[in-house]
Amino acid sequence: MYKRQLPHLGEIPNLVVLRTFSKMYGLAGLRLGYGVMPEWLADLLLRVKLPFSVNILAEQAGLAALDDDIFVSQTLLVVSEGRRLLERELSAMGCKVWPSQANFLMFEPPMDARTLFEALLAKGVIIRPLGSYGMPEKLRVSIGNEEENLEFLAKTAEVLRDHDRHS
């Protein structure tokens, strides 16, 4: 667990910090997470927890992941570098990019967001349109490895160039 993100644990009596293994560890298919909380609250939650809610393989994978500090450090570095690259290049393409500390960015392209989403999807690049969240002109892109980020940027630049030529 990254301790710097839990500064108030123990100071605030009813604080619960939830973590998922989906993003940092790439274990989304296991549907696994954990909570850090005061012991009294953990005891209450254990009383109402479903039996066998996590299978033994998922549990073992989660425990192994928690011990892999090197992987966490490498992942944080890849995400940090990828975030900077995507922020810089999307901005250079005329997109408005919102600040982020997560493994994804929200941006508004200089063309219709839904059209860009569909064009990228046709090219095999999957991003998330944010219309269902009340932000129809914004998109969300997950930060991948360097190869994935460069592919996303190249195909986005291609779609934006084609749009400019036909406008």
Where would I find each of the regions flagged by the language model?
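PLP-dependent aminotransferase class I/II
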Residues: 14-91, 95-98
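PLP-dependent enzyme catalytic core of the Aspartate aminotransferase-like
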Residues: 119-123, 128, 132-167
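Conserved small/polar residues in nucleotide/adenosyl-binding loops
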Residues: 1-5
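Short hydrophobic/aromatic beta-strand micro-patches
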Residues: 36, 106-108, 142-144
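Conserved PLP-binding catalytic core of the aspartate aminotransferase-like
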Residues: 79-80, 84, 88-123, 139
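Short acidic/glycine-enriched loop/turn segments that link adjacent beta-strands
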Residues: 29, 101-102, 134-137
